[in-house]
Amino acid sequence: MSRHEGSQGVEKRCHGGEEQVRETKGDGAPNGGYGWVCVAACATINAWVFHFFIFLGVMVGLEEVVADLRRHTWGLNSAYAVFLAYYLANDIFPGASHLSYAFIGGLSISQALIVSPVATLTTRLFGTRTTLLIGVALETISFIGASFASQIWHLFLSQGLCFGYGMGFLFVGSVGISAQWFTTRRSLANGIAAAGSGLGGLIYSLAAQAMIRNIGLPWAFRILAIIAFVVNTTCALIIRDRNKQIGSSQLSFDYRLFKKPQFLGLMVFGFLSMLAYVVLLFSLPNYARTVGMTAQQGSIVGAVLNLGQAMGRPPIGYFSDSFGRLNMASTMTFLAGLFSLVIWMFAKSFGVLVFFAVVGGWVAGTFWAVAAPVTTEIMGLVDLPSALSLTWLVLVLPTTFSEPIGLEIVAYNGGSYTGAILFTGWMYIAAACVLWGVRAWKIGDVEEQAAIAGKRASEVDPVAMVASQGSGGVPEGFTKSPFLKRLVMWQIV
């Protein structure tokens, strides 16, 4: 069987402590057709889910307030800092501390990840469409609530909790859809869907300032609420999952996955990637100011970073389908670290920093472009929802604490970003090394399945034949290649 003929495979699953090996028939994924409609809908949802912080940031240009605020809220991106400056300058929430404001931004991200098991359970009980519509309702309510906020706890409820929960239901409900519709083009489809986040950030960063200037902040939020409701509801209604066709487990917390070392490797890869990604995303515009650039130039750098992500994710997906998803994911993550160490470290001019924002943006968000395809490659489509649900829970820690870590590094170095850049670069490289180890495991698994099927390893589809170690039927005398050899050998996985 070739890599692109994912029609049949062997899958071993655990039930009540017993391992059962069964043959999985092809689920008839069309590799096109209505699947592209679902990809477009997922990209649109991602644009709305992740545009929020970009929108928050282009509200006003109060540089003297922003300069003070940035010293206290380094963890939030400069865009969000400007939004907070709007509240402070207008004395809307007197007595509210800088830390209170800073916590709101991180709260929404952590709540989106924490709610993932609930969203997975909702999908299993009521279906994907219901899960997405719950997210639409929560996100719409959050925008409307923010438009009427007059006390700090209103912001915690609207921008922190409510928006975070809505983001979680929308993201969890849509993140695995693209992978269900494709086999040979799975990574390309997921890359296009993931590109919506970067494209949405770019579009809304350009549109938000005009809305605030012409209609005011409250009505800007209300207009966003209306648009979000209409657009996301439309996407929720046209998205179709294939959970029944593939027999998706949809378990919120399948603890048995933690017994698999390859799954633990994926968790470490995501953990380290997010430590680096959040620091890069939130610090690049601020870094521009520390090397003598204006606030406007810093905002441009942030917008270009989003553009780079939108441009980079589809090509990463496309080449992943040709050269291997694990190969591309580990290589691109390594490049993200390398670019940070050799370009960002020495970027002191606007032109060089824009160049880094473009090339760094291409690879910085590799995890989001490959999360579903790589997890499918390792765990299989059946366990994909459960594996992703656990992944989002694990990512609560790095997305919550990477900001304070970066803040402490910058403060310890007297305001210099050298330490933060080193931290970012080496976390990316460490993540790439861990995933390269998972890749070596996968090569051994492919060798074993090839031996069972009586084929060469290059003829085995690494997705269709998702099996755990120790499956029966291995020919007598068969041994996998040594692990160290698998680390350096070439195999499309």
Language-model segments: residues:
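Intracellular terminal tails of multi-pass secondary transporters
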Residues: M1-I45, F50, L217-S252, E377, ...
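Hydrophobic core of transmembrane alpha-helices in multi-pass small-molecule transporters
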Residues: A47, A67-L69, E139-F143, I152-G173, ...
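Extracytoplasmic gate region of multi-pass secondary transporters
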Residues: W48, F52-V58, L76-Y87, K260-Y318, ...
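Interfacial helix-cap and linker-helix signal at transmembrane-aqueous boundaries
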Residues: E63-E64, Y87-I92, T122-T123, I203-G216, ...
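Intracellular juxtamembrane helix-capping segments at the cytosolic ends
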Residues: Y87, G160, M167-T183, A189-N190, ...
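Conserved MFS/SLC helix-loop-helix module at the cytosolic interface between two early adjacent transmembrane helices
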Residues: I114-H154, S320
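C-terminal ends and interior cores of transmembrane alpha-helices
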Residues: A137-S150, A236, F334-K348
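C-terminal transmembrane helical hairpin of 12-TM major facilitator-type secondary transporters
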Residues: V291-M293, Q297, A303-Q309, S320-V374, ...
